[in-house]
Amino acid sequence: KVQEALKKYEVLKNEDAEWHFIGHLQTNKIKDVLKFADMIHSVDRLSLAEKLDQRLQQEGRSLDILVQVNTSHEESKYGVAPEEALSLVKQTARYDTLKIHGLMTIGLFTKDEVKIRKCFKVLKEINDNIVKEGIDRVDMKYLSMGMSGDYQIAIEEGANMVRIGTAIFGARNTPDAYYWPSEKTDADRAKQME
C-alpha cells in the first residue's frame, strides 16, 4: 500500500490535495509514509506512536492522526481493542508531534446490519468517553467509519468521515493483506456472505 501511495503521490504531488494514509502501518515504512501523508488513520499501538514521534521530531513538524480501533474484534483486522482505546489516546497525546483528531474503525463484512451498526456504536461511545475526559492536545472531531457497503449505517451512527472508494472508482482487484489476507475484492466478499 505504501508503494502504491508513493506512486500516486509522485503523479499528483503538485495538485492541491490532502493525503490520508489508511491501512496498517509498519514502523519500517514510516519514513516513506511521511513523505506524503497529511493524516494517518491507523495509529493502533503505542510503539507506532513513539516511532512516528521520533521521526516527526527529526523533521521538525507535526502530523494529524486518527486512532484505529478494532470494534469488530476480528483477528484479521488491525486496531487497538476497544477497552484499550482510551489508554492509547492518553499515552499518544503526550507526543507534541501527534495531533489526535479522532477515531477510525472498519465494520464487519456481513449483511447483518445489526452487527455492523454495533461496531459503529462502539466507536461512537469510545469517542464520547474520550471527549468527556478532556485530554490535552486531543481534538476529537472525526469519526472515520463506513466504507462503500456500510457507509449509510456509519453516518446514521455518527460518522463524519467515510471511505467509499469502491463506490466511486469500482472494485479493485488487488489484495489487501493488511486486513483480509486474500485476493478477493469487497464485491467478492459480499457475494460470499449471501
Tell where the protein language model's regions lie, with residue ranges.
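C-terminal helical cap(s) of enzyme catalytic domains, especially alpha/beta-barrels
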Residues: 1, 9-12, 155, 159-194
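Conserved alpha/beta-domain cores
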Residues: 2-149, 157, 169
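Conserved active-site alpha-helix within GNAT-family acetyltransferase domains
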Residues: 152
